């Protein structure tokens, strides 16, 4: 007798296989040619204007500049939620991003429609990014949550 197992009488020649998928960690820069994008402090108005023209021509049929979903998600706040490289990779490499990037796949799951490849070049994608940066919402004061301890300043509310 060469077995040391329990007395069930059944033999097992199978090996234990793990069927769970390895969790893929999303690269915050996405997948594509853009690994590093230089962004200045201010807005390049010329670049933003060229980006606006492209957005008006190729993007507004599906995307709005607010936070509302049309076909695709609204653009509001995108530059706060995503890295510049991710945005540019999504614009220029949309098919690979939708197939392999977990963040892009989550958007596809939410919107249920694949973003079409618009054949946007790297320089044009940079213009779109600059336009989206220009549209970034400014932080606003919420005076309802501010407590003013000086009675002479209560007129502010």
Regions found by a protein language model. Give the residues of each.
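Axial heme c-ligation environment in periplasmic c-type cytochrome domains
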Residues: 6, 70-78, 95-124, 140-141
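Sequence context of c-type cytochrome heme-c attachment sites
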Residues: 35, 64, 105-106
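Sec/Tat-exported extracytoplasmic proteins
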Residues: 58, 63-66, 79, 91-95, ...
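C-terminal motif of bacterial Sec signal peptides marking the signal peptidase cleavage site
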Residues: 2-3
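Electrostatic cytochrome c docking/interface patches
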Residues: 16-54, 155-156
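Gly/Gly-Pro-rich "capping" loops immediately C-terminal to redox-active cysteine motifs
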Residues: 48, 52, 63-93
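Bacterial Sec signal peptide processing site at the extreme N-terminus
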Residues: 6-18
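C-terminal capping alpha-helices of c-type cytochrome domains
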Residues: 85-90, 113-150
